[in-house]
Amino acid sequence: MTSALSACGGKGSNIKEENVPADSMAYSIVKKAKGDSTLYGLACDGCTDSVVVFLPYEGGDPVTYEIIDARRLGKVFGRPKIGDRLALLVNPEDKEEALLVINIDELKGAWCNTFMPKFRDLDKMPRRLQRRMMADMPDSIKQKFLVPKELGFELKGTNTITPIGMRMRAETTDEMSPVEYPKQKRYREWRIYNGHLLLATKKHGIDTADIVLLRPDTLILRFKDKEQGYYKKLKY
């Protein structure tokens, strides 16, 4: 790794899903998962808004890829800095162009959102009764139970995930509470695969997400059925 960093002139899992190999989460910065066309490496000196200078983990000299169209189409996620770990998808028809760039070092970290609870079985009531119930409810009750909760996850460099704001198991007090929070999956592992973000749970397989936006303080992911935004949490 030291030699790779010098070349750049700066610093330095098992799941199942359709069309994804069972060992695709066994991530290595040197050895890619089977079927993954993503290139992994380091950002080198010379990266600009129009090109990325990239040193692949496989070795060799730095390669310059054009990213003008990728940036125009919103497919450059994060700003490559010298020594940052990157994931690239190269245009199969033009080996000098990257179609997608992900700054893995900017993607890592703790990402959260604030969720409001709702009263149990409220959805089963007609909307008119829901509005009446909320209007007639004393403010003291609302303040006691309608408390926002911060939930999220930390993407670690080891490709593991630490949940944020989630208990290991449901408690009796949770079941007795008149409110409930949106259910959150407890992800355990993550990786990039063909430009997608794979999030794996222990019991429920993988969720595949596409990155919509990645900024130092903001992450938006597009899942199969929704888009979810997160803010970066520096300490928790």
Give the label of every model feature segment.
Residues 77-80, 97-112:
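N-terminal helix-cap/turn-to-beta initiation motif at the start of protein domains
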Residues 73-87:
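Short nucleic-acid-contacting surface segments enriched for D/E, G, S/T with interspersed K/R
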Residues 61-77:
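Beta-strand/loop nucleic-acid-binding surfaces
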Residues 49, 90-97:
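Short, charged beta-turn/beta-strand-edge "cap" motif at the junction between a beta-strand
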Residues 4-7:
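C-terminal motif of bacterial Sec signal peptides marking the signal peptidase cleavage site
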Residues 106-108, 182-186, 216-236:
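Edge beta-strand at a domain terminus
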Residues 9-11:
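Bacterial signal peptide processing site
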Residues 20-42, 46-50, 60, 123-193:
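N-terminal glycine/threonine-rich, aromatic-flanked beta-hairpin/loop signature
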